[in-house]
């Protein structure tokens, strides 16, 4: 399936925050130092990569967005390396240079794809310097759609409430990657994106899904946020918004090599998507996929538009087409709804697939974007149709259905009616063939109560599985 992304080239974003240089010393190690019980690494590669807020800006640029970057640097060699690193990606930095502090640098020593140690070179920036950075950046707000505050608690983002208010007054969405024990600093932000540890540092231990949602809603009301996106590692993401149902997005990471910069990737993908016109739910799905790509890389990295398209397509393949379990189908439906797709569901035995079935399923598919066919398993068919049925076992019936162009997902159920599975999945439209009354259709009341529709379609006259079986038997 072709996955549609927003027009990232239309995105205009300002990133302000703690910029830093991620420096990597890499080499083999094969012995222990005689001076101390530590490995000796023979450095044969040195690499510099923009990190922190600079990595956010690079991710936006790599996706194709237009980005301006503001941050604080020292008068040193690492500032020059950082400047060169962002310019390679087409980002022109707006630095506030200070003479008495170094450019923040994170030096990592790696061997055999493993990080052995990290050394930090940094000093805290004071409030006056932070306010000078905001003042220097204020004019840029007139030319952007989204402001990102990338806070690593190094001092660049100190008391940003007034700047957030100025941005919101200009119609600019404000996204914050927060730090610290008090989110009141970000009062009025459109969206904050704490990880689970950062979230619990503010609200206390989260004991359940309901507890997480309740605590997030309290923060939203207290600090006038529009939404909170909690990133939860292997549990994916949870989006809690004002006056909207919560949204859980499962993780899509396949192999985790390094989580360095994953938070940067999330907020950059969110910012680029929102600035390009995506809904918040769509932006979260894109950001989740981007994070899944970047943690599969070593060190601070970016995600390109092509990588994102490929990953979204692969995710769709995994969430899949064809025969599924109920759990797999529930996830596939969540992904489809994030893409704004309408889901239609029907059910039946489909013992011997015939032209009437094909026509009916084509009509059902035309009512939406995705079609689910729930199929009675063998024991259920026998109870409903009697001895000698089904003619074809359930795995073969489902395989044939899955091969039809009109059918996206096929799922078995064991009961005599699909009441339970329909109630669990709650499609946007429930379809039944024949002369049923809507009020008599299993699961129909639940679908309607959830805001969905129930429709009855006619079968093709003179074509039925029973008639086909009788015709075959009469010719013996």
From Swiss-Prot:
The keyword rRNA-binding does not apply. SUPFAM superfamilies: Nucleotidylyl transferase, Ribokinase-like. Pathway: Nucleotide-sugar biosynthesis; ADP-L-glycero-beta-D-manno-heptose biosynthesis; ADP-L-glycero-beta-D-manno-heptose from D-glycero-beta-D-manno-heptose 7-phosphate: step 1/4; Nucleotide-sugar biosynthesis; ADP-L-glycero-beta-D-manno-heptose biosynthesis; ADP-L-glycero-beta-D-manno-heptose from D-glycero-beta-D-manno-heptose 7-phosphate: step 3/4. Homodimer. In the N-terminal section; belongs to the carbohydrate kinase PfkB family. In the C-terminal section; belongs to the cytidylyltransferase family. GO terms for molecular function: ATP binding; heptose 7-phosphate kinase activity; heptose-1-phosphate adenylyltransferase activity; phosphotransferase activity, alcohol group as acceptor. One of its GO terms (cellular component) is cytosol. Catalyzes the ADP transfer from ATP to D-glycero-beta-D-manno-heptose 1-phosphate, yielding ADP-D-glycero-beta-D-manno-heptose. This is Bifunctional protein HldE. InterPro entries: Bifunc_HldE, Carboh/pur_kinase_PfkB_CS, Cyt_trans-like, PfkB_dom, RfaE_dom_I, RfaE_dom_II, Ribokinase-like, Rossmann-like_a/b/a_fold. Gene3D superfamilies: 3.40.1190.20, HUPs. The active site is at residue 264. One of its GO terms (biological process) is ADP-L-glycero-beta-D-manno-heptose biosynthetic process. Disulfide bonds: none annotated. The lineage of its organism: Bacteria, Pseudomonadati, Pseudomonadota, Gammaproteobacteria, Alteromonadales. Residues 1-319 are annotated as: Ribokinase. Its EC number is 2.7.1.167, 2.7.7.70. Residues 345-476 are annotated as: Cytidylyltransferase. Keywords: ATP-binding, Carbohydrate metabolism, Kinase, Multifunctional enzyme, Nucleotide-binding, Nucleotidyltransferase, Transferase. ATP binds at residues 195-198. It catalyses: D-glycero-beta-D-manno-heptose 7-phosphate + ATP = D-glycero-beta-D-manno-heptose 1,7-bisphosphate + ADP + H(+); D-glycero-beta-D-manno-heptose 1-phosphate + ATP + H(+) = ADP-D-glycero-beta-D-manno-heptose + diphosphate. Coiled coil: none annotated.
